[in-house]
């Protein structure tokens, strides 16, 4: 689902479409690759309909520029339909394509797959804006420009305070088990953890020192402003 702040502040029509997804494991701690591939292959006909829909909406709206936030189907739209509108891609993942970016020593197949997926999202792009806190040179031949992430006005207007708690974000809610285990060893430390766990209350209060919160941009920023430290399993934008 779309974040509330996006829906409220975009001030433009929003047209949803179905897109491929990675499905989590039963414990919701990592991607289930086999399950994800099978699920997405079964829904290929829907994704092709989405590609046609994206192409149609680009034409009907008379878009001058298409801004793509790491969406696979937008890249495929430019591969198969060749829209005339200029496309600009924005994501921290485009830093993976920068020749000066150093990867940790990981499985070569996994890294090759990640780069391949990233390139598909940017098929036909005039520019790839790679988000990074570190300055790096442009790569004109590949259309890569490294830019810092933008901060929302609400973040800049927030006044920092000295809170006595740790703040965190879990991309996969299954890691809540690890948080609870750590909390048992360190019960005196107050924790406010955000997640996107379905079918739970906005706040799950384990005890007086540990709370899990559903994603809420206003509350998230408020807790971040007073945290002693911040920990996250993912979410470059929050960092």
Describe the predicted segments one by one.
Residues 66-81:
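An aromatic- and histidine-rich active-site surface loop
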Residues 81-146:
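Active-site-proximal region of nucleotide-activated glycan assembly enzymes
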